């Protein structure tokens, strides 16, 4: 029978490995993005609510696997397009932060 501290240690190493693996798979475009800022801006500008009104399936239909957005650069461009259309006046690093969060949570581009 394994000792509880050994199990916790193995779990910690496994989570650490997952975190390193996830960071290694982040596209170069989003490598230095401020994810906390992206989360804050997505909530502040009510992006999820806006998309839920415009798309079926609570706004998640836009994240279909073979949609028009199929690269990190196109994802960043779509966030920039929303910013322009809605006159949000986002700075480039804010657009990148928001796109990085969308990539992490929905698109999962690795390159």
Predicted features along the sequence, with ranges:
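Electrostatic cytochrome c docking/interface patches
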Residues: 23-42, 84-87
């Amino acid at each position: 029978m394994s000792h509880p501290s050994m199990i916790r240690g193995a779990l910690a190493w496994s989570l650490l490995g997952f975190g390193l693996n996830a960071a290694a798979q982040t596209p170069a475009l989003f490598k230095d993005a401020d994810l906390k800022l992206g989360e804050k801006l997505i909530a502040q500008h009510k992006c999820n609510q806006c998309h839920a009104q415009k798309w079926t399936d609570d706004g998640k239909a836009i994240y279909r696997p073979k949609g028009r957005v199929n690269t990190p650069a196109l994802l960043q461009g779509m966030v920039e397009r929303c910013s322009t259309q809605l006159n949000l006046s986002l700075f480039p690093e804010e657009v990148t932060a928001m796109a990085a969060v969308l990539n992490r949570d929905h698109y999962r581009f690795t390159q």
